[in-house]
């Protein structure tokens, strides 16, 4: 009775549920971008569009990392390469695990469907769920008020196979309708597929290299990888300090600033605050994306980031133009024009991703 009071659209045959008031959700790419920008803010350098092609290893130590943009001579290498972690381990002469890719497809529903549910739910106990490879996905009310449905879990030999198949979407909806019968594919506004990077042991590998001493592996990370990321980072930082301290003094940065100023979100402001922003910068008053109410000013803020990715998708993941019902049908040409003007290049040179 309490469950249906909180979530009236849940299956009326539900017999019990577990309430966890400490659970929640974040925007995964927004969080990652925030961490990256804060790292740069504190002195880190990020090399985008840079692929590791090989390594030189001598006497149990990586002496050089060769990339498509030159050669690095690192004191320490952290292998967090996802589905390619075993390749990096092989280059470093420290491979003791294998990655078997596992594809997962999720659907994003229109914001109007967000009113159907306000929590995180995953059905347990059915034959359909017992055959899954992991927790089995679920229904999530996102921080942007959409519903996310999925993912599924399908073994694949292709590490970059992010294709989306109709049968995956159908399977996910069939399973999650057990929880919420009101779910309908008609509310889907987009869908996507990611590839997990599990090991055959189905466990995280967070440890120092076994043969190569200036190496830390952070591999085999899958769900709940996002949840554990802050704790994993603390462990890896401790390992890194321990390894580096053998050759040099290591001290905490006394000027470290853990606060990263974010981009103002005008659609979440009250009228008075929004008017004040527009008065200071008229670009905040020019709405580019009607679905998400994203202004020209917010797009320019994204392009001025210290981790700037001046592409349509780069801007999309920072301030959300193109993430609404029309999926960029209206605003994409304007976003391309703003990027081109910012970079001082022709429209034809602006990339999608």
What do these predicted regions represent?
Residues 55-150, 154-163, 174, 183, ...:
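Flavin-dependent oxidoreductases
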Residues 238, 245, 347-353:
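Iron-sulfur (Fe-S) cluster-binding modules
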Residues 289-291, 326, 331:
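Short cysteine clusters
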